[in-house]
C-alpha cells in the first residue's frame, strides 16, 4: 500500500512550507491530531487525575487509563505493568536505583558501548557507591553488535544487564529477543538467577514492533512517548514485568 508524502506533510504544521526535518531520533514533530488533543484537554478538562473532587478529574483519569490501555496493547502487555514518567533519565533511574539493594560488593553490571548516557551514568553512580564492576560489550570490526562477546561476559557475578535496542549514534539494531534467549541460556548453564535485564527501547520502538510477552527474561523496558509523536509532557513509558 502506497502513501503520499504530501498528504503526510499536511498533518504537520512545520512541514507545510516544504521544510525537511531530520531529527526525529531526538524528538518527533507533533502532528495536528496531537496538538488538537492537547488543546482540547486544556479547554474542556484540565483536572487532577484520580481526583474525585470534580468531573474534570474523572475525565482526566479516564484519558490516562485509556492511554495506558493503548500502550499496553501496542506492546502486548498487561496495563498494570505500564508506568508513565516525564523523561528518559527519570525512567532509567527509577528502574536502576529501584533495585540497587540487590547488588553487593564484587557484583557486576554488564552494559554495551552503544548505550545512551542515561543508561550509563546511573550505573556508574551505583558502581562507585557499591564498589561493583561495570563490564562493556564491544562491537565487531564492522561495528555490528557482538553477541558472542555478550554471552561470554555473563558470569556468576552478573546481577544487572543494561542494553539498548538500537543505538542513537550508529543506528545498530540489537535483537532483544535474541538477547533474552542468550541471557536465559547462559543463566541456566551457570545455574544462576537471571540477571535484572533493563532494555532502553527509546530508539528501537520507532522502527520495530515489540511484543513483551516474547521477552520473558526482561525486568524493565523503557521507551519515549515523544519520539513516537506523543506530547513532550509524557516522555517515557516503563514496562516493568
Residue ranges and their predicted role:
Residues 1-241:
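Pyridoxal 5′-phosphate
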Amino acid at each position: 500500500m502506497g502513501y503520499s508524502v504530501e498528504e503526510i506533510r499536511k498533518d504537520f504544521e512545520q512541514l507545510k512550507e516544504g521544510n525537511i526535518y531530520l531529527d526525529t531520533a531526538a524528538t518527533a514533530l507533533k502532528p495536528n491530531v496531537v496538538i488538537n488533543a492537547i488543546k482540547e484537554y486544556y479547554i474542556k478538562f484540565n483536572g487532577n487525575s484520580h481526583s474525585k473532587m470534580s468531573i474534570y478529574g474523572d475525565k482526566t483519569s479516564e484519558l490516562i487509563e485509556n492511554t495506558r490501555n493503548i500502550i499496553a496493547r501496542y506492546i502486548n502487555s498487561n496495563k498494570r505493568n505500564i508506568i508513565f514518567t516525564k523523561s528518559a533519565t527519570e525512567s532509567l533511574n527509577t528502574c536502576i536505583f529501584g533495585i540497587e539493594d540487590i547488588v553487593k560488593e564484587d557484583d557486576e553490571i554488564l552494559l554495551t558501548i552503544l548505550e545512551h548516557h542515561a543508561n550509563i551514568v546511573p550505573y556508574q553512580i551505583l558502581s562507585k557507591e557499591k564498589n561493583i564492576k561495570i563490564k562493556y560489550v564491544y562491537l565487531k570490526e564492522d561495528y555490528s553488535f557482538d553477541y558472542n562477546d555478550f554471552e561470554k561476559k555473563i558470569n556468576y557475578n552478573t546481577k544487572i544487564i543494561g542494553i539498548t535496542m538500537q543505538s542513537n549514534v550508529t543506528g545498530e539494531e540489537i535483537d532483544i529477543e535474541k538477547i533474552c534467549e542468550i541471557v536465559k541460556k547462559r543463566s541456566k548453564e551457570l545455574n544462576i538467577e537471571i540477571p535484572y535485564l533493563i532494555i532502553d527501547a527509546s530508539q528501537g520502538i520507532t522502527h520495530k514492533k515489540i511484543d513483551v510477552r516474547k521477552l520473558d527474561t526482561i525486568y524493565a523496558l523503557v521507551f519515549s512517548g515523544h519520539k513516537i509523536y506523543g506530547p513532550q509532557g509524557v516522555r517515557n513509558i516503563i514496562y516493568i514485568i
